[in-house]
């Protein structure tokens, strides 16, 4: 029996569409600013990130944590209201394969991936609650973080934490979001807990092929989508956040203090409900930056960790 080359190609393409490419970590968080100068001071001076151009959006600016991860800052839209989060993004080995995979799973995807001027490829979808999610295939070569001539002309102090270890966002319904993040994308349970033992406020799941995680910040507001009317910009900034990993909290805070990078109201480090040392700072528009140790210093409340913790050795 003869099988045409065309048939074999279609079969291979179909199989590829059913295979999820690796999702290896958090790529970035994109937030809005109402004051670009103040925001630059915060991310460059206080947090120590590296400013660079935004190859994806000429109106934006990137503040790099390392060569692959960054905070994307965009101008505040007129209709933003209390929202300061534009999207969250995850790194994948193949943006095109991921686009095909999600399409095969019934997720609405764009017709093609976008190609940025830095050599990265990306596309954007919406999760079941309407949050924008990007999948980014990093450039094949990344230069510039240590002053080497490369893709970006970067300046600024070294970041206080050299990896984004998690991102968090407001979530109304865990089961609805789980169908996408755990069911389709393969995110793995990591930890869950709350301010009280009998109530879950936070649900964390790691990317399937790494140790960075997404934290659901569960709201007690009405189930559905969008931002509940009773949530202020400040409260929303606490929920929609990102976290930088550090090895030693005492050393990190001491560095910030000695270099006058703590602002007028210095944050107080504390052991969180997950047993990890952490402290919170906020950008000028209220987006929370959570500095957190990689591993717990005490027993977590509510549940045990069900996956390996991130490590500093995993940093790019």
Features from the language model and the residues they span:
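Vicinal oxygen chelate
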Residues: 18-21, 24-34, 61-63, 77-163, 168-169, 191-197, ...
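Short loop/beta submotifs within extracellular cysteine-rich repeat domains
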Residues: 41, 50-51, 69-72, 80-82, ...
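Hydrophobic h-region of N-terminal signal peptides that target proteins for export
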Residues: 8-17
């Amino acid at each position: 029996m003869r099988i045409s080359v065309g048939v074999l190609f279609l079969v291979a393409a179909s199989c590829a569409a059913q295979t999820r490419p690796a999702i290896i970590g958090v790529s970035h968080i994109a937030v809005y600013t109402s004051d670009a100068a103040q925001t630059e001071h915060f991310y460059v001076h206080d947090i120590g990130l590296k400013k660079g151009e935004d190859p994806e959006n000429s109106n934006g600016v990137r503040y790099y944590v390392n060569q692959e991860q960054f905070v994307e800052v965009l101008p505040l839209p007129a209709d933003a209201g209390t929202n300061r989060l534009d999207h969250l993004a995850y790194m994948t080995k193949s943006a095109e394969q991921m686009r095909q995979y999600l399409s095969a799973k019934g997720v609405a995807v764009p017709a093609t991936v976008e190609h940025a001027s830095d050599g990265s490829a990306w596309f954007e979808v919406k999760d079941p609650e309407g949050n924008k999610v990007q999948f980014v295939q990093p450039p094949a070569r990344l230069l510039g973080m240590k002053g080497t001539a490369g893709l970006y002309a970067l300046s600024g102090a070294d970041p206080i934490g050299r990896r984004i270890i998690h991102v968090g966002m407001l979530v109304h319904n865990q089961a609805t979001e789980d169908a996408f993040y755990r069911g389709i994308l393969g995110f793995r349970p990591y930890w869950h807990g709350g301010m009280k033992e009998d109530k879950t406020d936070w649900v964390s799941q790691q990317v399937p092929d790494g140790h960075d995680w997404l934290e659901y910040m569960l709201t007690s507001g009405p189930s559905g989508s969008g931002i509940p009317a009773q949530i202020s910009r400040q409260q929303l900034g606490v929920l929609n956040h990102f976290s930088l990993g550090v090895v030693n909290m005492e050393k990190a805070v001491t560095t910030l203090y000695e270099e006058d990078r703590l602002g007028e109201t210095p944050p107080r480090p504390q052991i969180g409900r997950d047993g990890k040392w952490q402290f919170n700072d906020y950008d000028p528009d209220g987006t929370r930056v959570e500095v957190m140790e990689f591993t717990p210093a005490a027993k977590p409340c509510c549940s045990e960790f069900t996956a390996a913790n991130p490590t500093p050795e995993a940093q790019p």
